[in-house]
Amino acid sequence: MSFIKEFREFAMRGNVVDLAVGVIIGAAFGKIVSSLVADIIMPPLGLLIGGIDFKQFAFTLREAQGDIPAVVMHYGVFIQNVFDFVIVAFAIFMAIKLINKLNRKKEEPTEAPAPTTEEVLLSEIRDLLKEQNNRS
């Protein structure tokens, strides 16, 4: 089998194609969630706590000196990314819950399987022993 043919078969398998579609949709969904957090959720939240923009929260470790830029920890951006993560995680959780619910087949009551020959014989022996004990 040629290398190209083998690669084509690998790439066209259902799992690989499904994964590729999932990654592309996931990336697009991530952009939507980031916009939701940055443009919809964070501004009112900042307004509620005094008109603060979370992106501006930062802690300067070292001031800029000449050509050397300042060393700054932007923890406001981190807080915003935590909100992104929580929303994405919740959305994925809800999607998986929905998929599991749709995939769950109604369990039909199954009849008890017929007893095996061994079980039938053991039941007969048990019944005979009970009869003998009751006679005594």
From Swiss-Prot:
What coarse category fits the chief subcellular location reported for this protein?
A: membrane
Q: Name one GO cellular component term.
A: plasma membrane
What Gene3D superfamilies does the record point to?
Large-conductance mechanosensitive channel, MscL, domain 1 (1.10.1200.120)
InterPro entries membership? Mechanosensitive_channel_CS, MS_channel, MSC/AndL, MscL_channel
Question: Would the keyword Cell membrane be found if you checked this record's keyword annotation?
Answer: yes
Its transmembrane ranges are: 10-30, 76-96
GO MF terms listed in the record are: mechanosensitive monoatomic ion channel activity
Keyword set, alphabetical order: Cell inner membrane, Cell membrane, Ion channel, Ion transport, Membrane, Transmembrane, Transmembrane helix, Transport
SUPFAM superfamilies, per database record: Gated mechanosensitive channel
Q: Which Pfam families does the record associate with it?
A: MscL
Q: How does the entry describe its membrane topology?
A: Multi-pass membrane protein
Localization per Swiss-Prot or TrEMBL = Cell inner membrane
Q: Which residues form a coiled coil?
A: none
The family database entries (PANTHER family) matched by this protein are listed as: LARGE-CONDUCTANCE MECHANOSENSITIVE CHANNEL, MECHANOSENSITIVE CHANNEL MSCL
Function, as annotated, reads: Channel that opens in response to stretch forces in the membrane lipid bilayer. May participate in the regulation of osmotic pressure changes within the cell.
**Protein family (similarity comment):** Belongs to the MscL family.
- Quaternary structure per UniProt? Homopentamer.
Tell me the HAMAP family matching this sequence. Answer: MscL (MF_00115)
Protein name in UniProt:
Large-conductance mechanosensitive channel
Species source reads Citrobacter koseri (strain ATCC BAA-895 / CDC 4225-83 / SGSC4696)
Highest classification ranks of the organism: Bacteria, Pseudomonadati, Pseudomonadota, Gammaproteobacteria, Enterobacterales
